[in-house]
Amino acid sequence: MIQQQTTLKVADNSGARGIMCIKVLGGSNRRYANIGDIIVASVKSATPGGVVKKGEVVKAVVVRSKKGVRRADGSYIKFDENAAVIIKDDKQPKGTRIFGPVARELRDKEFNKILSLAPEVL
């Protein structure tokens, strides 16, 4: 469960290292985001020379969550960390590489470019 003030690791090479959730998109008073949901976040730490700078406000999609998601067969998929990928307004990732595994649930939300760049889809 990602909510306001939650810090997430960035799982791409856009230049950001860590972000903090400002808002969960999808409703006027929506509180929690899970895998596949879009959030608005502030960049808290960034690598020098990256596309994204510290202090920027960006949109990101959650790709890993400690809370996890329940699948149709009754199983749960959970990760060791909360991670997100920074995206543009057209749902395409800003970076050109994705680090770490991502969940298959991103396919339902039509983030196919992220799935094709990811080294492992669970």
UniProtKB/Swiss-Prot annotation:
Keywords linked to the UniProt accession: Ribonucleoprotein, Ribosomal protein, RNA-binding, rRNA-binding
SMART domains for the chain: Ribosomal_L14
Any one annotated GO CC term: cytosolic large ribosomal subunit
Role this protein plays: Binds to 23S rRNA. Forms part of two intersubunit bridges in the 70S ribosome.
Subunit text: Part of the 50S ribosomal subunit. Forms a cluster with proteins L3 and L19. In the 70S ribosome, L14 and L19 interact and together make contacts with the 16S rRNA in bridges B5 and B8.
Stored NCBIfam families: rplN_bact
Name the record gives this protein: Large ribosomal subunit protein uL14
Organism per entry: Clostridium tetani (strain Massachusetts / E88)
Gene name for this UniProt entry: rplN
